[in-house]
């Protein structure tokens, strides 16, 4: 199997022991780690906690993949999207510092978490507002809108396609189709990750496994059709060894 670029995501802080466990089950070190961002005021370990996580991730050259977390809001209107987009972007910028992010290139992906059931199905209006809210947070840092979702969530992909048709950007998709029995290393499978309907946005990542086999991480694989460094990792955030902000 060709070289694989893989990563993890969790709803709790990254530790040295967790990285060791993840590397053991993945077969290679994770190149990125997905963590949640919602608002600068949100507390709790579900959110990224840089005072705990920055140094350990930096020591292993693991980049942070920001996930925008307000799953029950994503079917709302433009105003809700604007509010959440501004809050998500402000959280990322306040966490790492605007000047630091500018020094690291100033342009990064952020993935909107759409779980594909109940209230968590995307609306065109919400996505349009969310993208606008992201852009309002800073004149110096660009957070590029991406979407995490389920391949079969037709309501979400239809809504996103409408937004794209009206010129609203989407920089990429992270598709969740977890496997239940397959062993590592897992190979990319286009048939399992294609959104239905297809909207033309690039599929960057496949979340192919939830916690199992003794590993308490979600696992994701980078699409081998893209250049992992240039097309994905360059747009994820390298955490600083030390950072003064809360």
PLM features: what roles do these ranges have?
Residues 138-158, 171-173, 177, 205:
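Aromatic-lined carbohydrate-recognition surfaces of secreted/lumenal glycan-active proteins
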């Amino acid at each position: 199997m060709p070289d694989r670029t893989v990563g993890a995501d969790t709803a709790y802080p990254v530790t040295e022991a967790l990285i060791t466990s993840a590397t053991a089950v993945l077969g290679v070190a994770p190149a990125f780690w997905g963590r949640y961002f919602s608002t600068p005021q949100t507390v709790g370990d579900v959110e990224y906690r840089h005072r705990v996580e920055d140094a350990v991730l930096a020591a292993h050259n693991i980049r942070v993949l920001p996930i925008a977390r307000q799953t029950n809001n994503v079917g709302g209107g433009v105003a809700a999207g604007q509010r959440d987009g501004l809050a998500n972007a402000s959280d990322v910028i306040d966490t790492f510092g605007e000047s630091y992010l500018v020094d690291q290139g100033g342009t990064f992906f952020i993935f909107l978490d759409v779980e594909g059931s109940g209230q968590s199905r995307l609306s065109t209006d919400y996505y349009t507002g969310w993208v606008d809210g992201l852009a309002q947070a800073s004149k110096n840092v660009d957070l590029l809108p991406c979407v995490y979702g389920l391949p079969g969530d037709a309501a979400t992909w239809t809504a996103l396609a409408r937004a794209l048709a009206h010129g609203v950007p989407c920089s990429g998709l992270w598709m969740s189709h977890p496997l239940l029995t397959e062993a590592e290393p897992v190979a990319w499978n286009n048939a399992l990750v294609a959104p239905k309907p297809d909207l033309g946005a690039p599929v960057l990542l496949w979340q192919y496994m939830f916690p199992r086999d003794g590993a308490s991480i979600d696992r994701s694989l980078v699409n081998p059709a893209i250049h992992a460094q240039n097309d994905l990792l360059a747009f994820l955030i390298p955490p600083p060894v030390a950072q003064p902000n809360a």
